[in-house]
């Protein structure tokens, strides 16, 4: 179930997902495995094209198949569990969205969307952009706000120029989403929205995601207030 609240007729939506999960394979390993699988798939296609010109011995294909299988094992082993309470991923994002909305002037037109099933293929976000009856506008998706680490702006598909202009120069330069990593912003970008994903953390943050260590003993919430203030300030300034 997605939770939706609006003030006025919003042209900007603040988004965060509510669900959490645990997985036995770290997210970094999964991303590397997906990237490696795509690389070896490209190599196999190149070898297939070369075979039209030069015969290839069978062992080449056997070796490629074995390497591709090994590369895909971490992905196949990434079963979903419930050992993570999801303090960082993504109670912190939901808290940031609600706090930013609270800080904005009461007459600000804004939409708030708290999605479900992000951890299950972005199902909640994809259902909402498909069936919610909202024409594509702009969204800020908040996913993972740690107490320490760098603030990051992440995008998929096209560069969200107008969103970056709204945020201003005080924010970091955006980076493309790592292959194999999914965020609700992907569902919005696929549906034609202009969207920026916002995260704060470090490699230590990434190691906690989807593990039993993602709990309140490892998160105080200071980053939530910091990012919410920064978001609300940028949104309010853009409307003056």
Task: Pin down the residues of each PLM region.
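Acidic/histidine-rich catalytic neighborhood of metal-dependent amide-processing enzymes
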Residues: 1-2, 52-163, 177-185
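Short alpha-helix boundary/capping segments
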Residues: 27-35, 85-92, 219-226
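Active-site beta-strand-loop-beta-strand hairpin of nuclease catalytic cores
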Residues: 9-13
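Histidine-centered divalent metal-coordination motifs
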Residues: 17
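Active-site-adjacent substrate-binding region
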Residues: 137, 145-240
């Amino acid at each position: 179930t997605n939770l939706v609240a609006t003030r006025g007729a919003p042209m900007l939506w603040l988004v965060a997902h509510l669900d959490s999960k645990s997985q036995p394979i770290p997210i970094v390993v999964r991303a590397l495995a997906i990237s490696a699988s795509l690389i070896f798939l490209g190599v196999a296609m190149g070898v297939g094209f070369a075979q039209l010109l030069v015969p290839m011995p069978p062992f080449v294909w056997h070796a490629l198949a074995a390497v591709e299988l090994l590369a895909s094992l971490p992905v196949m082993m990434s079963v979903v569990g419930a050992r993570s309470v999801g303090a960082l991923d993504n109670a912190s994002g939901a808290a940031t969205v609600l706090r930013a909305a609270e800080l904005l002037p009461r007459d600000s037109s804004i939409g708030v969307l708290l999605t479900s099933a992000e951890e299950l293929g972005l199902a909640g976000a994809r259902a909402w952009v498909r069936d919610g009856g909202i024409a594509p506008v702009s969204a800020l998706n908040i996913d993972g706000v740690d107490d320490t680490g760098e603030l990051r702006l992440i995008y998929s598909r096209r560069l969200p120029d107008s969103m970056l202009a709204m945020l201003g120069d005080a924010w970091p330069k955006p980076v493309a989403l790592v292959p194999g990593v999914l965020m609700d912003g992907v569902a919005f970008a696929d549906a034609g929205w202009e969207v920026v994903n916002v995260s704060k953390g470090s490699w230590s943050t990434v190691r906690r995601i989807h593990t039993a260590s993602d709990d309140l003993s490892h998160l105080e919430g200071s980053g939530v207030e910091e990012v919410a203030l920064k978001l609300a300030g940028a949104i309010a300034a853009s409307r003056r």
